[in-house]
Amino acid sequence: LNRANPVRSLSLCDNSAAITAIANDLDYSSIFAQQLKLLGKQGDLLIVISASGNSDNLLKAVGMASELGMESYSLTGFDGGKLKQLTVGRNIHVETPKGAYGLVEDAHLAICHVITECIRSVK
């Protein structure tokens, strides 16, 4: 919190009221895309994390980010699914057997820590 150059960031998973309202009024697959439509802007960065790479809510979020002029990066597991294809060149993929959620989640956690330290070292 004492950093001279803080990084603006937010989690689209944290607002349970928004998630519930969007899922109820539209559908669950739109919970992130609709938030991005309101909050995202050109030049922003979207990072999505998925074991399978096939979650409709994340695929729609990447589509919305593209419409808004945002860049999308993904962390995927198993075979990477559709997210790996949508974010070619902007994907960190952990190849694991399908169903090995623990391995993927642990690897993604470690990768997120590395990314955080890289951002801190630049700022």
Where are these regions (language model features)?
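Glycine-rich phosphate-binding loops that contact phosphosugars or nucleotide phosphates
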Residues: L1-K123
